[in-house]
């Protein structure tokens, strides 16, 4: 039985910091971001199914979101303004991501590859699955901006405005629900979110 470096690589996602060009009150790494995106994507899928007649697999969407940035362990986290500076750079970066995704898939033992390839290679995502993961990814970036701004870090003011436009372009009923029910709490202190539920 040959060894695989797959999970050793994924473990290093925690070493890759997001928002590398910006001053952060609290640094966020790709590993913790991926977990939050997985939780939010699962919630969006569950809301879609329960409230708006959707029929998506919420558990699969959570897994897709968990692995959505896995290729960054090989490429690093390129800052968004650089990644989307123009269409040519965006297209080339997509090609690099695809190569990195395939390299990760190739690390998985043959007998497990059919399980992990559909999670890592985004070409296996349906349009609806991809849409929900992208919504969750943008929402989590927006939540990071709210947290930084609440801590007095105005460095994230323009990013918040840019993400509001992104969220508007990806708007859905389930996102509106999430924004109304869950997002306001992210601007409150621990005391404020704890006062209704004493231990």
Swiss-Prot record:
Residues that coordinate or bind a divalent metal cation: 33, 68-69, 137
EC numbers, comma separated: 3.1.3.89
Catalytic EC class: hydrolase
SUPFAM superfamilies given in the database record: HD-domain/PDEase-like (SSF109604)
Catalytic activity of the protein: a 2'-deoxyribonucleoside 5'-phosphate + H2O = a 2'-deoxyribonucleoside + phosphate
Compartment list: Cytoplasm
CDD domains: HDc
Necessary cofactors: a divalent metal cation
Superkingdom to which the source organism belongs: Bacteria
Cellular component aspect of the GO annotation: cytoplasm
Site feature: Appears to be important in orienting the phosphate for catalysis: 18
Family indicated by similarity: Belongs to the 5DNU family.
Protein name: 5'-deoxynucleotidase KPN78578_26370
The species this protein was found in: Klebsiella pneumoniae subsp. pneumoniae (strain ATCC 700721 / MGH 78578)
């Amino acid at each position: 039985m040959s060894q695989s470096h797959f999970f050793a690589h994924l473990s290093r996602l925690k070493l890759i910091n997001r928002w590398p060009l910006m001053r952060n009150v609290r640094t966020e790494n790709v590993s913790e971001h991926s977990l939050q995106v997985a939780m939010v994507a699962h919630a969006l899928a569950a809301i879609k199914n329960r409230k708006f007649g959707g029929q998506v697999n919420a558990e699969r969407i959570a897994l897709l979101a968990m692995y959505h940035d896995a290729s960054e362990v090989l490429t690093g986290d390129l800052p968004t303004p650089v990644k989307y500076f123009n269409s040519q750079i965006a297209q080339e970066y997509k090609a690099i991501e695809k190569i990195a995704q395939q390299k990760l898939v190739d690390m998985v033992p043959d007998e497990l590859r059919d399980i992990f390839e559909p999670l890592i290679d985004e070409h296996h995502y349906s349009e609806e699955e991809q849409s929900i993961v992208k919504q969750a990814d943008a929402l989590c970036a927006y939540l990071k901006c709210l947290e930084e701004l609440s801590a007095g870090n105005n460095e994230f003011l323009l990013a918040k405005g840019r993400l509001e436009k992104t969220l508007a372009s990806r708007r859905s009923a389930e996102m509106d629900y999430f924004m109304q029910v869950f997002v306001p709490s992210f601007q409150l202190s621990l005391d404020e979110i704890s006062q209704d539920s004493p231990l």
